[in-house]
Amino acid sequence: VAWLHAFLASLADLGFPSPRPLPAFGGQSWTVAEGLLWEIVSFIPGHQVGWDAEPPMVQIGALLARYHGAARRIQVSSQRPGVIPLADVPAILLSPKLDLACPDPDRAAVIRRLAGRLAADLEDRGHRTAARLVIHGDFTNHNVIADGKPPAATGVIDFHRAHLETPLADIAYGLWRSGRPRQDAGCLDLPLLQQFVRGYASTAPPLPGAASALPVYLYGRGLQMIAKRVLEGQPGSGMLAQAEWTAANAAEITDAVATALR
């Protein structure tokens, strides 16, 4: 939490609309009491966008680009402790630990196949040497705040998955949920995805290779969530269906992103 609050303080100092840590505990913004972690940050007025149709995805994509612009100006000296960077996911899912969290051999075989593909795809795209910044880590519409009439995307909350990663991964992690047509869908709404990408591109400098890389980071997000459960020793591979769909439709997603960026 010290890593995160230091970053959030720097982000707020740059004027980005995000929670600012408040020194309410003897000069600190967090403390441990009775075995529990307590933290306090400032309030961002407005309401959670969630599944609302407004503000449009173009605005939300542009807000993420604004965040990345601010994050590039903040230097951090180390990775956030306790996170699972995407580059670490294949090794976790190809280890014997997977069998404990996923006792179904057929599902485990699918996960291992996708994990091997992820390792190859990341290597092909030079992921390990790509430029990094502190990504939000969960930039879904449920963590975007809207205010005004008509509603406009005005702020971002819940940075608890923030860590060093490539900015393209942040786009994909947000679209993993908010790019679906509805919460229980196991697929993406490509026109919705295109709106988000257009909004991002309207504000951010070009991201080389975005069209072909975005599907990789999308199905990688699903595998990352499975890897987290594997390390925790918990069963759970419910996100596998969407990861499979995304990997199977990578060409269509690439075409949709390329069209949006023209």
Name each region found by the language model:
Residues 168-204, 219-237:
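Active-site activation/catalytic loop segments of kinase-like enzymes and analogous catalytic loops
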Residues 206-218:
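All-alpha amphipathic helical-bundle segments outside canonical DNA-binding/catalytic cores
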Residues 97, 225-262:
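ATP/Mg2+ or Mg2+-diphosphate-binding catalytic cores
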Residues 62-72, 119, 176-179, 258:
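Short amphipathic alpha-helical signal-transduction/dimerization elements
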Residues 1-78:
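ATP-binding pocket architecture of kinase catalytic cores
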Residues 71-78, 126, 208, 233-234:
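Long, hydrophobic, amphipathic alpha-helical segments used as structural scaffolds
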Residues 21, 119-169:
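Active-site acidic catalytic loop and adjacent metal/ATP-binding pocket
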Residues 25, 51-109, 130-132:
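A cross-family kinase active-site recognition segment
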